[in-house]
UniProtKB/Swiss-Prot annotation:
GO terms for molecular function: rRNA binding; structural constituent of ribosome; tRNA binding. The lineage of its organism: Bacteria, Bacillati, Bacillota, Clostridia, Eubacteriales. CDD domains: uS7_Bacteria. One of the primary rRNA binding proteins, it binds directly to 16S rRNA where it nucleates assembly of the head domain of the 30S subunit. Is located at the subunit interface close to the decoding center, probably blocks exit of the E-site tRNA. Belongs to the universal ribosomal protein uS7 family. InterPro entries: Ribosomal_uS7, Ribosomal_uS7_bac/org-type, Ribosomal_uS7_CS, Ribosomal_uS7_dom, Ribosomal_uS7_dom_sf. Keywords: Ribonucleoprotein, Ribosomal protein, RNA-binding, rRNA-binding, tRNA-binding. This is Small ribosomal subunit protein uS7. Part of the 30S ribosomal subunit. Contacts proteins S9 and S11. GO terms for biological process: translation. It comes from the Bacteria. It holds the Pfam family Ribosomal_S7. It comes from Heliobacterium modesticaldum (strain ATCC 51547 / Ice1). The keyword Kinase does not apply. GO terms for cellular component: small ribosomal subunit.
């Protein structure tokens, strides 16, 4: 533990178009090599594609997708008496959102498709419909936590 005080977390500013902090955080996850304007162009393009295909508000689709992707439980390795146990722990709200956004971007990149705009739009729409790689990752994470329920008393 550091002796000095902890560093204050930087506040994320809402994006100019949708006035949403979630959109800014998603753009930051998409960003590679500090190219934020490129990341924002990809994200806004994907949200436009979602609007065209679903005829719904893209923010509602994104919120639904994020809700279906955010994990409630995860496992953490805990060493007890020479053995490593996978201990299920609850995920804090901030980390839930971060993991959800990270998984959406990760599985968007792994999709087959022409452009990142189409891949991201497809993954968000799939997640909103409870399908896709990011939702599968959440379910796998929950299964791991469920399988290791016996070690829950090792929580710290």
């Amino acid at each position: 533990m550091p002796r000095r005080g902890s560093v204050a977390r930087r506040e994320v500013l809402p994006d100019p178009i949708y006035n949403s902090k979630v959109v800014t955080k998603l753009a930051n996850q998409i960003m590679l090599d500090g190219k934020k304007s490129t990341a924002e162009a990809i994200l806004y393009g994907a949200l436009d594609v979602i609007k065209e295909k679903t005829n719904k508000n893209p923010m509602e689709v994104l919120e639904a997708a994020l809700k279906n992707v955010m994990p409630l439980l995860e496992v953490k390795a805990r060493r007890v008496g020479g053995a490593n146990y996978q201990v299920p722990v609850e995920v804090r709200p901030e980390r839930r959102q971060t993991l959800g956004l990270r998984w959406l971007v990760k599985y968007s990149r792994e999709r087959s498709g022409k452009t990142m705009i189409d891949k991201l739009a497809g993954e968000i729409m799939d997640a909103a419909n409870n399908t896709g790689g990011a939702v599968k990752k959440k379910e796998d994470t929950h299964k791991m936590a469920e399988a290791n329920k016996a070690f829950a008393h090792y929580r710290w």
